[in-house]
Amino acid sequence: MNKTPLLSVSPNLHELHICELLGNNANQNSRYSHIVKQYIAEVLQSSDDKIAATNTQPHLLTLGQLGFGDGHEIILLLAALQEANLQNPLIQQQTRIHISVFEQGPVNCKQLQHTWQQQGLLDSDHHLFDFTQALLNGEIAAIEGCQRLSLLQNQIIIDLYQGSPLAQAKTIATPNKQRITHWFALPHTNQEAHSDQYFHQRSVWEYGRLSVDNATFLAASTNDENIAPTIKKQLAFCGFLSSTSFKSTDDIAIAERNALRQQLQQQFAYNPLPPLHSNNNSPIAIIGGGIASASLALSLAERGKDVIIYCKDDTLGQGASGNKQGAIYPLLTPENGSLSQFFQQVFLYSRRRIQALVDDGYDIGHEWCGVLHTGFDQRSQTRLDKIIDGQAWPSEIAFAVSPHQATQLANVDIDKPGFYYPLGGWACPFEFAQASIAKAQTLTKVRIVYNSDISSLESHSSGWQLFSAEDNTPIATHEQVVIASGAQLTQYKQTKNLQITGFRGQVSHVPPQGELAQLNTVICANGYLTPQHNQLHCVGASYVKDPQHLDFCPIEQHENSLKMKQSFPNSNWPNDIDVSNNDARVGVRMVSRDHFPVMGCAPDVEALFTRYAVQQQSKDKPSLWQHYWQTTPAPIYDGLYVLGGLGSRGLSSGPLVAECLAANLCGELSPLSVELQALLSPNRMWLRKLLKGKALM
C-alpha cells in the first residue's frame, strides 16, 4: 500500500536555486547540486511509518549532518521544508524537524554574516533572506559543545555541535526513542585533511549509536572523483545504508550499536534519566510560578504536552523571578571547564528564547546592551585577570577592554580595565515568565491553578497526590510531577535533603538622575547595576544565607547604595545613586555549592543512606562498593522530578535546563551532554563521594 508522504515534495524544488546558493561547489561539478537536491527530496519524502516507529512523538523527523560550512545546505533544507509546508502545513500535522550538526572548525555569526553579505543573501528582497536572518538571530558563537537553535516557530530545531565530532557525539545521551534517520555529509568533511576527524571508525560508530537501524548516509563530494572507498567501507561496516540502497540491515552492526548504547548507559548508570511513562496524554504537573516553571511549561508545550501549573501566588513571577531587571551573561572560569562551558551554552539559549518571544509580539522588557565586568578590589581584579588571560575567548562571548573603551561602552566614567560580554544585557524576569506561559498556551492545554500552595506530596498507586496547604487535603493526582518552586524547593519530605541553600537578595530601585541616567550597559563589579527602564535602575543585591524573613531591610538598602561607590571610588556618577525612597524588592535565590542548578529525577535520599548503611556494616572491600555505586542507578522517586537551584543566574540558566528536562521527559535528544546532566543531578553531592569510594560523613 502506498504511504502518504510526511511532507509533499514540491515539483518546483529547482526554484530554490540550489546551484546559485552552492556557488563554486556546484559550478565545479553539477553532481553536488544533484546530490543536495537528492538529499532534500529524500528528507521530504520520509514516510510517517518510519518516523512513528522510531520516535515517541508523532511526526518528529530527526536528521544528522556532518559539517556546517557556510550554512548553505542548512538554508536550502530550511527553504525546502518551508516550501513543502505551504502545500502541506507542518503545524497542522504537528511535524517537527530535529537536525544534529557536527562541525570540527569554529563557526560564528560574524563569519556567516560576512559570507552571506558578499553573496547577497542578506538583501531583504532575496528569496532566502528569512532563512539566513533566522540563523543569524541565533547568534551562533565559536564555542565547543551544543548550541540549540529553534527556528520557524520551533518547527525546526538545530543542535550545532562544534569541536571534535567524536568527542561531541560520544557525549550525547541515547534517547529512549528519538533516533536519526538520515545523515548528510558536506564535501569538506570527506576531504583528506578532515576525513579522519569526521569518519574515524569510532566516530562513525557513535553516529550509528544515535541512529535508527536502517538510517541512510549520503556523503557528498564536489570534485569529479567519488567518495573515497575507505569512507564508503567504513559507513557500510558500521551498518549505514546508502540513500538508494534497499538491502537489509546488518545484524552485527545493529548489535554493536546496541552495545554502545548500553555502554554509555552503564557509564552513567548512577544518574538515571527519566523513564518514559505509558500515558503520554496525561498532563504533567509543575509546582512553581517562576522562570523555571514557565520555561519548562513552554518546552513541554512545544512537544505537544499538556501542563498544569500550581502557583502559590495570585500571579506568576512573585518569587526570585519577580525582579524588574536581571542581568544575562555567562559565568566564565580561567580553565573554561564544565561550569564555564555550561554557562556559555545556557546564556546563549536564554538570549535566543527571549528574542524569539519578543519577535513573536510578547512584551518582555529587555535590552541587549552588553555587560561590563570589572574588579572592585585587588582580589577581584586578580580573579578577573585570570579569567581574561586563561583562554582565547571568542570575541562574541567576551573581550578585554581598556578604561577608555569601558567608559565609551558604559557612557559613564570607568577608570579601570574590564571584561565585556557583547551579547549580554538585561531582561525582566517576571515578564519573561508570563510571556513563556502565554506562548505555551497557544500550543497546548496549559492550565494555571493560582493561589494553590502545595504543602506535601504522597506517592499513590496512580501517581503523586498533591495536598493543599490550606486544609491539608488532596487536590489532585498526577503521574508526573516537577517541583520547580524556587525557594520552596526543599519544603517537601522528598526534597528536604537536597544540598542547596537559600540566600536572601534585596534589589534596590533608584531613579535616573545626573550622570547615572546616561548609563548604557549593565555593570557587574561589587554587585550589579542596570541601565534605566521605566524610570528606574536596579542595583544590588544583598546576599544573606538562610534568611529569617523577607521584609525590607534599611541596612541592606544602604549597603546597595555603596556598591558602585566602592567599585569606582574615583568616579562621580555613583554619587547619583539615591536609595532614600526605600523602593526595593526582596527574594530568595537557591544556590548549590558548585554553582550548577539541580535538574532531574528526585533522589530518594533515605534509600541512598540505607544502602550506604549496609555498605558500612559490610566486610566487602571498599572497591567493590565503589564499583556498585558506579554501575547501579541511584535510588529515585519514580515520576517525581526537581528543577531549581538556579542561583543568581537563573535568568541565564533556567530556559536551557528546563529544555533539557522536557527533552528527557519526552525521550528526545537533549541539548546537554551526559556529563553535564550528571553535574546537574540532584544526587550529585552524595554520589561524588561514593563514586570515589569515600565516606559520606
Swiss-Prot record:
Q: Which organism is it from?
A: Shewanella frigidimarina (strain NCIMB 400)
Its keywords, alphabetically, are: Cytoplasm, FAD, Flavoprotein, Methyltransferase, Multifunctional enzyme, Oxidoreductase, S-adenosyl-L-methionine, Transferase, tRNA processing
Record's Pfam families? DAO
What cofactor is needed? FAD
Q: Which GO terms describe its biological process?
A: methylation; tRNA wobble uridine modification
As for family, the record states:
In the N-terminal section; belongs to the methyltransferase superfamily. tRNA (mnm(5)s(2)U34)-methyltransferase family. In the C-terminal section; belongs to the DAO family.
* Cellular compartment(s): Cytoplasm
Q: Which InterPro entries match?
A: FAD-dep_OxRdtase, FAD/NAD-bd_sf, SAM-dependent_MTases_sf, tRNA_MAMT_biosynth_bifunc_MnmC, tRNA_S-uridine_synth_MnmC_C
EC number from the UniProt entry: 2.1.1.61, 1.5.-.-
Q: Give me the gene this protein comes from.
A: mnmC
Keyword Secreted: yes or no? no
The record's section on HAMAP family has: MnmC
Annotated stretches, region: FAD-dependent cmnm(5)s(2)U34 oxidoreductase: 287-697
Q: Per the record, what are the reactions this protein catalyses?
A: 5-aminomethyl-2-thiouridine(34) in tRNA + S-adenosyl-L-methionine = 5-methylaminomethyl-2-thiouridine(34) in tRNA + S-adenosyl-L-homocysteine + H(+)
Q: Please identify the protein, giving its name as recorded.
A: tRNA 5-methylaminomethyl-2-thiouridine biosynthesis bifunctional protein MnmC
Identify the main location.
Answer: cytoplasm
Return the GO cellular component terms, semicolon-separated: cytoplasm
Among PANTHER family, the record links this protein to: SARCOSINE DEHYDROGENASE-RELATED (PTHR13847), TRNA 5-METHYLAMINOMETHYL-2-THIOURIDINE BIOSYNTHESIS BIFUNCTIONAL PROTEIN MNMC (PTHR13847:SF283)
**Which GO terms label this protein's molecular function in UniProt?**
flavin adenine dinucleotide binding; oxidoreductase activity, acting on the CH-NH group of donors; tRNA (5-methylaminomethyl-2-thiouridylate)(34)-methyltransferase activity
Protein's job: Catalyzes the last two steps in the biosynthesis of 5-methylaminomethyl-2-thiouridine (mnm(5)s(2)U) at the wobble position (U34) in tRNA. Catalyzes the FAD-dependent demodification of cmnm(5)s(2)U34 to nm(5)s(2)U34, followed by the transfer of a methyl group from S-adenosyl-L-methionine to nm(5)s(2)U34, to form mnm(5)s(2)U34.
Region (tRNA (mnm(5)s(2)U34)-methyltransferase) residue ranges read 1-269
